[in-house]
From Swiss-Prot:
Binding partners and assembly: Homodimer. Interacts with UBE2A and UBE2B, one homodimer binding one molecule of UBE2B. Interacts with SHPRH. Interacts with HLTF. Interacts with SPRTN; leading to enhance chromatin association of RAD18 and RAD18-mediated PCNA ubiquitination and translesion DNA synthesis. Interacts (via C-terminus and phosphorylated form) with SLF1 (via BRCT domains); this interaction is required for efficient repair of UV-induced DNA damage. Interacts with SLF2. Interacts with SMC5; this interaction is increased in a SLF1 or SLF2-dependent manner. Interacts with DNA damage up-regulated protein DDUP.
Pfam families, sorted: SAP, zf-C3HC4_2
Keyword Protein biosynthesis appears in the UniProt entry: no
Biased segments, Basic and acidic residues type: 479-495
Protein name according to UniProt: E3 ubiquitin-protein ligase RAD18
Record's keyword annotation contains DNA repair: yes
GO biological process: DNA damage response; DNA repair; positive regulation of chromosome segregation; postreplication repair; protein autoubiquitination; protein monoubiquitination
Region: Disordered, residue numbers: 152-197, 400-423, 456-495
Motif (LR motif): 232-240
Summary of the function given for this chain in its UniProt record: E3 ubiquitin-protein ligase involved in postreplication repair of UV-damaged DNA. Postreplication repair functions in gap-filling of a daughter strand on replication of damaged DNA. Associates to the E2 ubiquitin conjugating enzyme UBE2B to form the UBE2B-RAD18 ubiquitin ligase complex involved in mono-ubiquitination of DNA-associated PCNA on 'Lys-164'. Has ssDNA binding activity.
Length: 495
C-alpha cells in the first residue's frame, strides 16, 4: 500500500486527486487492500481494517448501520482499479512533465481569434448565397423586362456608349458561370456523417444479452473466460475457511498457549499479550481468506513477529530518550556530562515542576495560616474558661476558710470582721486584677499567686489561733451565736 505522500498529483493532473481519494480506505486512508463492501450501505473498506473495527463496534464506521463480519462481501473491481492506477501513475506523471505548459495568454488569444473570424466566414457565405439567388432570378426574367432594364441602363449611363461588345459578352459569361444549374439544385443532398447509423444487435449465445454485431466476438471471448474465472474463484473460496471467534475470558492460560502453539505463534508474555497476539493473527488470517491469493499461516506468523519486534524497538527508543543509562566503564566526567545534558534537555520540565510546587506551597501556606489563627482563638477561649472556673473554686475555698477561722476565734470576731472584710476586698481586687491580666498570664501563675497569699494570711493569724484555745462546748455556742448574727446580715445584704 502506498503512503499518503505518494498521492500528490501535479497541478496539470489535479483532476486525478478525486479518483485517488475515492480509491482509499476510510479507516487507514491507504489504497484499498482486499476491498470489502457492506451490502446494507455500499461502503467499502480494507478487509483487515473493517474486521478490526467490527471487533470493537458492530456497525459501519461511516453511517453506523449494524454490520457483522459474515455480511461483508468482496469488491474485486476496486482492487483492480487500484492496481491499474498504480500502474498508470508513472506514465501520467511522465506525460505531465513532458508536455509543455500552456500559457493563459496564448489560450486567450486563440479564443479571441475564433470569436473574430467565425462571424466573417458566415457573412461571406451568406453574401455568396444572396448573389447566386439574384443571378438565378435575373436569368429567368422575361424578355420584356430585360429590354426595359437595358433601355433604362442606356439612358442612365449614356456616356459609356464607347464600351465594346466584347466586354458585354464577358459579363454574361461570368454570370452564367457563377449561377448554379437548376438541375443540380433539384438533386437531393447526400446524408451528413453526423447522423447515426442504425446499429444491429445480436443476442449472446452464452449469457443472452443483446450485444452490437461488431462487438459480439469480443464479448463471447470475455464471456467464456468469465465462466472459467468463476469456477476457479469458487474452488479457491472453498479451500480456506476463516477462523471462528474465541471467548478469551473463558480460556485458561494453558488452553490459550495451546491455541497459539497450533498456529506456530510465540507463547512468551503475560495473558494480555498472548490474547493480543492471537487476536491479531485471527484478524490477519480471516482478512487473507478474502483475497484471491491468500497468504499462508506461516507468512502471517512472520509478519506478526516483525510487527512485535518493531513495536519493542520503538518502545525501547522512547525509554532511552527519557532515561539516563550508565555503564561500569564510564568515568566521572562522562557521567557528569550525561547529567548536564539531561538537565539542559529537561530544563523546561523542571521549571514547570518548580512553578507548580511553588503555587501549591503558597496555597498550603495560606490554608495553614488560617488554621493556626483558628486554633489560637480556640486555645485562648479554653484558657479563659479554665481560669474563670479556677477563680470561682478559689473564691469558694477562701470564703470557707475565712468562715471557719472566725468561728474558731469568737472572742475576736468583732474586731476581726473589719480585717476580714478588708482582706476579702484585697482578695477580690487581686482576683479582679488577675481577671484583667488573664489574657497575658497563664492559669498556673494565677493559682500560684492565690496560694501564696493564702499562706501569708495563715501565717499572720497563726499566733491568734494558738492563743485562743476554746473547749468544744464554747465552740458550739459561739458557732450558734455567730450563725444567728450572720443570718440577718446576709438578709440585709440581700435586701
Amino acid at each position: 500500500m502506498d503512503s499518503l505522500a505518494e498521492s500528490r498529483w501535479p497541478p496539470g493532473l489535479a483532476v486525478m486527486k478525486t479518483i485517488d481519494d475515492l480509491l482509499r480506505c476510510g479507516i487507514c486512508f491507504e489504497y484499498f487492500n482486499i476491498a470489502m463492501i457492506i451490502p446494507q450501505c455500499s461502503h467499502n473498506y480494507c478487509s483487515l481494517c473493517i474486521r478490526k473495527f467490527l471487533s470493537y463496534k458492530t456497525q459501519c464506521p461511516t453511517c453506523c448501520v449494524t454490520v457483522t463480519e459474515p455480511d461483508l462481501k468482496n469488491n474485486r473491481i476496486l482492487d483492480e482499479l487500484v492496481k491499474s492506477l498504480n500502474f498508470a501513475r508513472n506514465h501520467l506523471l511522465q506525460f505531465a512533465l513532458e508536455s509543455p505548459a500552456k500559457s493563459p495568454a496564448s489560450s486567450s488569444s486563440k479564443n479571441l481569434a475564433v470569436k473574430v473570424y467565425t462571424p466573417v466566414a458566415s457573412r461571406q457565405s451568406l453574401k455568396q448565397g444572396s448573389r447566386l439567388m439574384d443571378n438565378f432570378l435575373i436569368r429567368e426574367m422575361s424578355g420584356s423586362t430585360s429590354e426595359l432594364l437595358i433601355k433604362e441602363n442606356k439612358s442612365k449611363f449614356s456616356p459609356q456608349k464607347e464600351a465594346s461588345p466584347a466586354a458585354k459578352t464577358k459579363e454574361t459569361r461570368s454570370v452564367e458561370e457563377i449561377a448554379p444549374d437548376p438541375s443540380e439544385a433539384k438533386r437531393p443532398e447526400p446524408p451528413s456523417t453526423s447522423t447515426l447509423k442504425q446499429v444491429t444487435k445480436v443476442d449472446c449465445p452464452v449469457c443472452g444479452v443483446n450485444i452490437p454485431e461488431s462487438h459480439i466476438n469480443k464479448h463471447l471471448d470475455s464471456c467464456l473466460s468469465r465462466e472459467e474465472k468463476k469456477e476457479s474463484l469458487r474452488s479457491s473460496v472453498h479451500k480456506r475457511k476463516p477462523l471462528p471467534k474465541t471467548v478469551y475470558n473463558l480460556l485458561s492460560d494453558r488452553d490459550l498457549k495451546k491455541k497459539l502453539k497450533e498456529h506456530g505463534l510465540s507463547i512468551q508474555g503475560n495473558k494480555q499479550q498472548l490474547i493480543k497476539r492471537h487476536q491479531e493473527f485471527v484478524h490477519m488470517y480471516n482478512a487473507q481468506c478474502d483475497a484471491l491469493h491468500p497468504k499462508s499461516a506461516a507468512e502471517i506468523v512472520r509478519e506478526i513477529e516483525n510487527i512485535e519486534k518493531t513495536r519493542m524497538r520503538l518502545e525501547a527508543s522512547k525509554l532511552n530518550e527519557s532515561v539516563m543509562v550508565f555503564t561500569k566503564d564510564q568515568t566521572e566526567k562522562e557521567i557528569d556530562e550525561i547529567h548536564s545534558k539531561y538537565r539542559k534537555k529537561h530544563k523546561s520540565e523542571f521549571q514547570l515542576l518548580v512553578d507548580q510546587a511553588r503555587k501549591g506551597y503558597k496555597k498550603i501556606a495560606g490554608m495553614s495560616q488560617k488554621t493556626v489563627t483558628i486554633t489560637k482563638e480556640d486555645e485562648s477561649t479554653e484558657k479563659l474558661s479554665s481560669v474563670c472556673m479556677g477563680q470561682e473554686d478559689n473564691m469558694t475555698s477562701v470564703t470557707n476558710h475565712f468562715s471557719q477561722s472566725k468561728l474558731d476565734s469568737p472572742e475576736e470576731l468583732e474586731p476581726d470582721r473589719e480585717e476580714d472584710s478588708s482582706s476579702c476586698i484585697d482578695i477580690q481586687e487581686v482576683l479582679s486584677s488577675s481577671e484583667s491580666d488573664s489574657c497575658n498570664s497563664s492559669s498556673s501563675d494565677i493559682i500560684r499567686d492565690l496560694l501564696e497569699e493564702e499562706e501569708a494570711w495563715e501565717a499572720s493569724h497563726k499566733n491568734d489561733l494558738q492563743d485562743t484555745e476554746i473547749s468544744p462546748r464554747q465552740n458550739r455556742r459561739t458557732r450558734a451565736a455567730e450563725s444567728a448574727e450572720i443570718e440577718p446580715r446576709n438578709k440585709r445584704n440581700r435586701n
